[in-house]
Curated annotation (Swiss-Prot):
Biological process per Gene Ontology, one example term: DNA-templated transcription
Name of the gene this protein is made from: rpoC1
Keywords from the UniProt entry: Chloroplast, DNA-directed RNA polymerase, Magnesium, Metal-binding, Nucleotidyltransferase, Plastid, Transcription, Transferase, Zinc
Full protein name: DNA-directed RNA polymerase subunit beta'
Enzyme Commission number(s) from the entry: 2.7.7.6
Native source organism of the sequence: Zygnema circumcarinatum (Green alga)
Cofactor binding note from Swiss-Prot or TrEMBL: Binds 1 Mg(2+) ion per subunit.
Amino-acid positions noted as binding Mg(2+) in the UniProt annotation, renumbered to this chain: D520, D522, D524
Amino acid sequence: MIPEDHLQYIRIGLASPEQIRSWAERRLPNGELIGRVSKPYTIHYQTHKPEKDGLFCERVFGPIKSGVCACGKYQGTISTKDSPKYCEKCGVEFTEARVRRHRMGYIDLQCPVTHVWYLKNRPSVIARLLNQPLQDIESLVYYDSFLARPVTNEPTLIRLLPTQSKLYKDRSQSTFDKPLELFLFDEPWQSALSNFFSPKWFHLIQIREMLTGADVIHKLLSGLNLTNAMFHARNQWKHLAKKAPESQSEVIEAQGPVPQAEEEKQRDQSIQQQKDAVLRRITLIRDLLQSQTQPEWMVLRTLPVLPPDLRPILELKDGQLIRSDLNELYRRVLYRNQLICQFSVEDPFCISMMQKKLLQQAIDSLLANGAGGNIIRDRNMRPYKSLSDIIKGKKGRFRENLLGKRVDYSGRSVIVVGPYLSLYQCGLPREMAIELFQPFVIRGLIINHFARNPRAAKSMIQRRHPIVWKILKMIVDDHLVILNRAPTLHRLGVQAFQPVLVRERAIHLHPLVCTGFNADFDGDQMAVHVPLSLEAQAEAHLLMSPYFNLLSPGTGDAIVVPTQDMLLGLYALTLGATLGIYSNINTYKYQSDVSFTQKTDSKIITFSNFSDALTAYHQGIITSDLPIWLYCRPEIAVMNNSQGDCPVEAQYQPKGIYLNVYEHSQIRTDKLGKTVQKYIRTTAGRAVLNQQIEQAIQGTEHAYKAVKQLNIILN
């Protein structure tokens, strides 16, 4: 086992048979090698003690009680320099009982077995790697067909048979990969052949010339050179690329009758599908080369056995035993593994072939119950939980126990919408914040001389002294929190926010960041974590802020975009007359109790700056859709509806000042044509939106400046 302090990362992948053995095999001081599970037994039905060499064997997995051997010769003995390291009689090592939680065993399989994850999953890794149809691969794995074994370079007996017995016939085959020549077991010539030869010689012919089962897949995968396969796959892709049209215009401009153009389209689609398949195969081979994984490891010759404490047998008070489903599935594998040895002596081919098929199905059920065929059930017709069922889903080992652990300085609550928040802010409940930041609050109370010791500070926190909230407010202003929503499917599921204390018990979240979390406000919950170290806080500032997660990492598209009620709100806020100065703001096509604008016969109000317009809006003097004339800087360009920008009205004023009135603007120029004054026709709602956009841009600029300064300090 790797020491915990040396563990830097975990990588899930294929393991070689030698590596699986190294996980479980140990050598006793007398030279005996242990670790192999050979008997399909768990515990004795009377004594409830583990059976030797069974699934709960103490020699293989360690003692049930610390320092107590299986035979009872030694009681409470822990291995030291002077005491023996194991019991000479039963072979149990003197060690702690907790080793049964991580010590593994292994089953030495009597025949190769294909890993169902790499065979049955869509897409099938084995079928893609061998570049063969999945149907043909499955017929070989489950002993429905066979290959003619190439014993010599000369034609074999089966290869001289008529070609109509080939299962693989008239299939579109690739340029560089030959299809498999498969033969069915129920062909008429087989019965005639068995009558011609004696049973002994017929069995020898079958062994000599028929190759089937996972042994075929192992030979094909072990004979596969990944480097050459990559070279051929790339050449195949180039060959297909030459067949494809250079542009879509060649298809559109095709001359001749319509059926001919339709055939060309179908041919191009077929070529594109072949190119996609070859590209996926290239990607798979590249991943195998980079991870230094051998393809033949997808066929199991050694099956690892989980530690017994991960598949326990528990005894209730009334004496009833509760067993893990994995124990029954392991027993089924061991039973069928033993039967192969027994029948291989009596019948070298037929019966042993059926036993190998049963072993393949048993291991399929152990790894993924139901993937290889029928679902195995218990007496109550409840399906057994396989390894796949244990580790997948919300209640699986990863999401329930490993990723879903309770951690310190974390909390969880329901999320609600917080439209008043900035993009980088979140509303944190005060009761949750006082618990998350309690050590920081205690330190703040002591430093500011409000408490003499931690005990007095905790007492103030429990009494909710008013000064506690002020200290907490100072702390959260300088500290980010990390929000996470399960399942974390991509890095946007974990982002850092500046907390804002709220009195409610729900977490307030800005609606624009919901897309990254895949969250909505119908009862979803989110977890809050507090980064403690300086490195974690710097990473939260530099990498995890919503300002630096505006684009999707998968597609590159903008992920922070307004949707639904935000778009309706922006539309209502910026709603105004669209006909310029010709529109009659007092005329509406409909009447309602609550109108957007109060009817008035006054002229359009003129404002000299944004502040006056916003003040009038907030005081209720004007409404959001009431047209106003608003002063703007002369250098700001104004977009008019007319193509030629012709003024609707032109006035000549004293001192040579010209006033040109357009549909959406008024421009005053001097004698030299220089713009002196400019007013734009807009609404108070659009002025509010403009102010919000300016503040957001300024906030982003300040954030980038802060990041640059922090980078300079760190470097």
